[in-house]
Amino acid sequence: MSHDPTPISDNPAEFTLDPVIAARLKLNDAGLIPAVVQAVDTREVLMMAWMDTHALAYTLATRRGTYYSRSRDEYWIKGLTSGNVQEVTDVALDCDGDTVLVTVHQTGGACHTGARTCFDADPLLGPGQ
């Protein structure tokens, strides 16, 4: 007889970050840290979003890109409603402890507009400009 493991909650607020990792973070006054999201295959920067300790803990536990929406004041598990899922392969903290780099396999667009990346297709400065 097989035993099904307890399903993982879809509520990031129920997850607590390991205290050793939490001690390394330098959160802003709102308790958030910027997360730069990069494609594992192309190294293209896909988006920047915010995480709190619960979103980071959930991401580390589930390998699902999870962020905190400041405008909606809620957690955002990338792809939960859009299907544009981020399978997280790596998470690294920068040398100052104030930014995380999240490397992902991106399904569909990373941007809420549906585009592959959130960064402007019409750059402010580029080669030859």
Curated annotation (Swiss-Prot):
Keywords: Amino-acid biosynthesis, Cytoplasm, Histidine biosynthesis, Hydrolase, Magnesium, Metal-binding, Zinc. Pfam families: PRA-CH (PF01502). Zn(2+) binds at residues 95, 111, 118. InterPro entries: PRA-CH (IPR026660), PRib_AMP_CycHydrolase_dom (IPR002496), PRib_AMP_CycHydrolase_sf (IPR038019). The lineage of its organism: Bacteria, Bacillati, Actinomycetota, Actinomycetes, Mycobacteriales. GO terms for molecular function: magnesium ion binding; phosphoribosyl-AMP cyclohydrolase activity; zinc ion binding. This is Phosphoribosyl-AMP cyclohydrolase. Pathway: Amino-acid biosynthesis; L-histidine biosynthesis; L-histidine from 5-phospho-alpha-D-ribose 1-diphosphate: step 3/9. Its cofactor is Mg(2+); Zn(2+). Homodimer. Belongs to the PRA-CH family. Mg(2+) binds at residues 94, 96, 98. It is found in: Cytoplasm. Its EC number is 3.5.4.19. It catalyses: 1-(5-phospho-beta-D-ribosyl)-5'-AMP + H2O = 1-(5-phospho-beta-D-ribosyl)-5-[(5-phospho-beta-D-ribosylamino)methylideneamino]imidazole-4-carboxamide. It comes from Corynebacterium efficiens (strain DSM 44549 / YS-314 / AJ 12310 / JCM 11189 / NBRC 100395). GO terms for cellular component: cytoplasm. GO terms for biological process: L-histidine biosynthetic process. Catalyzes the hydrolysis of the adenine ring of phosphoribosyl-AMP. Binds 1 Mg(2+) ion per subunit.
